[in-house]
Amino acid sequence: MPPRVVRLPSLTGLRWFAALAVFACHIAQQQFFADQQVGTALLHITTLGSIAVSVFFLLSGFVLAWSARDKDSVTTFWRRRFAKIYPLHLVTFLIAGVIIFSLAEPTLPGGSVWDGLVPDLLLVQSWLPEPTIIAGFNTPSWSLSCEFAFYLTFPLWYRLVRKIPVRRLWWCAAGIAAAVICVPFVTSQFPASAETAPGMPLNELWFACWLPPVRMLEFVLGIVMALILRTGVWRGPGVVSSALLLAAAYGVTQVVPPMFTIAACSIVPAALLITALANADVQGLRTGLRSAVLVRLGEWSFAFYLVHFMVIRYGHRLMGGELGYARQWSTASAGALALAMLAVAIVAGGLLHTVVENPCMRLLGRRRPVATAPDPATDEAPKLTRA
């Protein structure tokens, strides 16, 4: 079993690229490229956002299980998890509220943004099958609703997974991955409902993408993969092979029905890549993701993730003048605008990480142990015994 104190900086670097993929997805969806061919081509990268979110959920389970210490208490773990995500969520929630109040507009056709005020504030929006509530004040925060459920149940899942015989961990991982792959087959049997996106009926999308218990499958798979590595039974492919498999999975998302792009296509290669990167860090092998710049960006990525959509959406409206969201630009100008938005989001993320995220972690998560795997959203040792 590798020492649990081994840091996993490659996973921090990976988190940055996942956050960048979500940014690219939202840039493509904003549609401010006047050239329709370019705009249509960019829509092909939107599935990267789904892959990235799945990577986030896998990473959460993996990092918490990797850094778990039996002597720590459940209540302290919950307090530290709260300190990690909620203050930053609250600050970005308030920022979004000020902007939306000033604009006085719905976030989606057919509903008011104010419908999601309380669910978004309490991080329960993903439990409700209503797009105007899930989009809420700050659209990306829907994933925090899932993460909140993950953190509440992690001590139980970790305890259960540790009871699985080591020789059966791979079978357990295969079973969970198979369950994720089966989700779109299950949703295809749901009664018809209005489409929120082409090929994505609301009821199916809510169940497969937003509902926390379903996305928890990915989180639990991350826990299992961490224990596979910790117990020394990892025999999977290397980093390059796993990355190529994930790239191939992205290619598959271009030809399968949309519901399969949420997690079914990418779950296996994403889980393999995360574990391969962690194994490379343990073995001291090069991964290309451990540079100081990538690690720093990875540390900022949680704040970047929460602020980037506001920069894109309301930046579009601000730059659009009288045309607002309908304004489009030439390919060169739109590309420059996208890069400027990326720069603003990075700076804003770094600032929020420095003045909100870190201070709140120090204030509310005192006496926390040194992070064993620097994951910007889940980077300290969990608590596993009853306080």
UniProtKB/Swiss-Prot annotation:
GO terms for molecular function: acyltransferase activity, transferring groups other than amino-acyl groups. Pfam families: Acyl_transf_3 (PF01757). One of its GO terms (biological process) is lipopolysaccharide biosynthetic process. The chain crosses the membrane at residues 8-28, 45-65, 85-105, 139-161, 170-190, 209-229, 236-256, 258-278, 292-312, 336-356. It is a multi-pass membrane protein. One of its GO terms (cellular component) is plasma membrane. Keywords: Acyltransferase, Antibiotic biosynthesis, Cell membrane, Membrane, Transferase, Transmembrane, Transmembrane helix. Its main location: membrane. Catalyzes the acylation of the mycaminose sugar during midecamycin biosynthesis. Belongs to the acyltransferase 3 family. PANTHER family: ACETYLTRANSFERASE, ACYL_TRANSF_3 DOMAIN-CONTAINING PROTEIN. This is Acyltransferase MdmB.
